[in-house]
Regions:
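Noncatalytic, basic helical substrate-engagement surface that gates or grips nucleic-acid strands
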Residues: 1-113, 123-141, 231, 236-251
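Conserved SAM-binding loop
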Residues: 116
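Short, charged, surface-exposed secondary-structure boundary motifs
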Residues: 141-151
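Accessory alpha-helical DNA-binding modules that contact the DNA backbone or grooves
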Residues: 154-157, 165-239, 261-262, 268-275, ...
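Conserved active-site carboxylates
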Residues: 160
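Conserved "right-hand" nucleotidyltransferase catalytic core of DNA-directed polymerases
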Residues: 245-247, 251-290
């Protein structure tokens, strides 16, 4: 079976360890049926997504074979991480985004410096004094100030800006004619730390001329719905789900099964990962979290 996704995950983990040297690592997976709540709000949410290509050099798999291989690789990746001092979380009926948002603000990590590793723009709304986003594709760290500098929008108002613009990757159309530049230029108050709401944007449209502003005023319901789906400031998690996450964080045993990993790598045909620095780091991490 092709193993491009497993290798990619391991290489990103290795790179993060070298760059950040974190005290703890938490990997969050989408829970089974994770999109259910958002699909109840909008049944088209995430419809029509192209499957992620995990094996860049393999072109002879059918769509069904790609899907089977993806599930197999995800299971294998989880097995690898199970041998490491890495916390893995997967909450039924909850998307990974909501769990990550909860982790950023939960008492367990209060006062910690946190780095979210993702290419997803959804996480930019969570940048604050203690939280950075690292984007692997661009190989860059994004801080709160960088968000304001790059988009002209404060993280506090990022979900509102994205609700106006829409998100093609999640199949959520926004107001036609609006992009980050248009939003930042016409609604400059969104660069402030103060939280603004759709009504503030609609009020500002009254003084402006142009079809795009008419479309915005007429399309308020769509923007409100987009906001519900995109905002991560208050994650859609029950008290029980939060308690389950808290329990896992508190009771996790940091262990490292180096020999088992080497056996698995031989079985799966891994040849190019240098484990020496990761072994040193993981051994240190196990001691640190005893």
């Amino acid at each position: 079976d092709p193993i491009g996704g497993i290798k990619g995950s391991m290489k990103i983990l290795q790179k993060m360890i070298r760059m950040i040297q974190p005290s703890q690592i938490v990997i969050v997976w989408d829970g089974p049926n994770g999109s259910r709540k958002r699909k109840q709000i909008n049944s088209n949410y995430k419809e029509g997504r192209a499957p992620i290509r995990l094996n860049r050099n393999v072109n002879n798999l059918t769509d069904d074979e790609q899907m089977i291989n993806k599930v197999w690789q995800q299971g294998k990746t989880i097995e690898y991480f199970n041998q490491m001092p890495v916390i893995q979380l997967c909450v039924p009926e909850i998307e990974a985004d909501d769990v990550i948002s909860y982790l950023i603000n939960c008492s367990h990590y209060e006062g910690w410096q946190k780095v979210i590793v993702s290419n997803d723009k959804d996480f930019l709304q969570l940048c604050d004094d203690f939280t950075l986003v690292y984007r692997p594709v661009k190989d860059e760290f994004v801080s709160r100030n960088k968000v304001i500098e790059e988009y002209g929008i404060h993280p506090t108002n990022m979900a509102l800006a994205r609700a106006l613009i829409g998100d093609n990757s999640d199949n959520l159309p926004g107001i036609r004619g609006l992009g980050f530049k248009t939003v930042a230029k016409n609604f400059p108050f969104l660069a402030e730390e103060k939280t603004y709401y759709l009504q503030h944007v609609v009020d500002a449209c009254e003084e402006k001329k142009g079809k795009v502003f008419e479309r915005l005023v007429e399309g308020q319901d769509r923007v409100k719905e987009n906001y519900k789906l995109m905002q991560l400031y208050s994650p859609t998690m029950s008290i029980q789900s939060k308690q389950k996450v808290d329990w896992n964080l508190t009771n996790f045993k940091h262990e490292f099964s180096y020999i088992d990993i080497l056996k698995m790598m031989r079985q799966d045909g891994f040849g190019e990962l240098n484990w020496s620095d990761m072994k040193i780091y993981f051994d240190k991490m196990v001691k640190l979290n005893k």
